[in-house]
UniProtKB/Swiss-Prot annotation:
Originating gene: priA
UniProt xrefs under PANTHER family: 1-(5-PHOSPHORIBOSYL)-5-[(5-PHOSPHORIBOSYLAMINO)METHYLIDENEAMINO] IMIDAZOLE-4-CARBOXAMIDE ISOMERASE
Reactions it catalyzes: 1-(5-phospho-beta-D-ribosyl)-5-[(5-phospho-beta-D-ribosylamino)methylideneamino]imidazole-4-carboxamide = 5-[(5-phospho-1-deoxy-D-ribulos-1-ylimino)methylamino]-1-(5-phospho-beta-D-ribosyl)imidazole-4-carboxamide; N-(5-phospho-beta-D-ribosyl)anthranilate = 1-(2-carboxyphenylamino)-1-deoxy-D-ribulose 5-phosphate
InterPro entries, per the entry: Aldolase_TIM, His_biosynth, HisA/PriA_Actinobacteria, Isoase_HisA-like, Isoase_HisA-like_bact, RibuloseP-bd_barrel
Domain of life: Bacteria
EC number, UniProt record: 5.3.1.16, 5.3.1.24
Organism the protein comes from: Mycobacterium leprae (strain TN)
Protein name: Phosphoribosyl isomerase A
Function noted in UniProt: Involved in both the histidine and tryptophan biosynthetic pathways.
Coiled-coil intervals: none
Length: 244
């Protein structure tokens, strides 16, 4: 099974940006979010990981734009950012996206999250945004501004609720081009039987080769952001590596 690559388009005020370690104010602007997504589609992407950072930070939303983008793309879209209640969930699903990624809600409102998982099944993934502090694996919420509890406790609860997929990010790696946290990915994939998508730190084709070795252990895909925008490699090059 080949590793699925999901180019990331993180949106702030309609622009495609990349943050460093998820910190507001660390944005690098890469132009129109729609143009970025269409570029990755032209380059061969099967999926786009589309994130409303304004909604994630609770400072507004790009809801109309994201809906327009999903409508104009021919590839599958995983939609994320600020989806924490029925209104934001229904708006996300109404775009026609293939999958919605919940983050903060899994920590702050586990009862609602369980209901959503039960109702929508594999259209729901949960993002596990992890920060390792003094050896403890802590989850981060609200745009990585708040503590969301112990990773392993939350993972066990979500597994029990029937969550169909997890997106695992080491927040200290995201946007740094420092390489992925392979130990974290292995630990999570070994504790669940559902697919895991890796996120954060990919900087080279060798990083993708390393992640691809974990497909038999349940790593289904990898989100790639900064490395593509910084032209460390092209998407066609990356796809060729993981499809070998």
């Amino acid at each position: 099974m080949s590793l699925i690559l999901l180019p990331a388009v993180d949106v702030v005020e309609g622009r495609a940006v990349r943050l460093v370690q998820g910190k507001a104010g660390s944005e690098n602007d890469y132009g129109s979010a729609l143009d970025a997504a269409l570029c990755w589609q032209r380059d061969g992407a099967d999926w786009i990981h589309l994130v409303d950072l304004d909604a994630a930070f609770g400072r507004g939303s790009n809801r109309e734009l994201l809906s327009e983008m999903v409508g104009k793309l021919d590839v599958q879209v995983e939609l994320s950012g600020g989806i924490r209640d029925d209104d934001s969930l229904n708006a996300a699903l109404a775009t026609g996206c293939a999958r919605v990624n919940l983050g903060t809600a899994a920590c702050e409102n586990p009862h609602w999250c369980a209901q959503v998982i039960a109702e929508h099944g594999d259209k729901i993934a949960v993002g596990l945004d992890v920060q390792i502090v003094d050896g403890q694996h802590r989850l981060r919420g609200r745009g990585w501004e708040t503590d969301g509890g112990d990773l392993w406790d939350v993972l066990e609860n979500l597994d029990r609720q029937g969550c169909s997929r997890f997106i695992v990010t080491d927040v200290t790696k995201d946007g740094t081009l420092d390489g992925p946290n392979l130990d974290l990915l292995a630990s999570v994939s070994d504790r669940t039987n559902v697919p895991v998508i890796a996120s954060g730190g990919v900087s080279s084709l060798d990083d993708l080769r390393a992640i691809a070795k974990f497909t038999e252990r349940g790593i289904e895909g990898a989100i790639v952001g900064k490395a593509l925008y910084a032209e460390r490699f092209t998407l066609p090059q990356a796809l060729a590596v993981v499809r070998m």
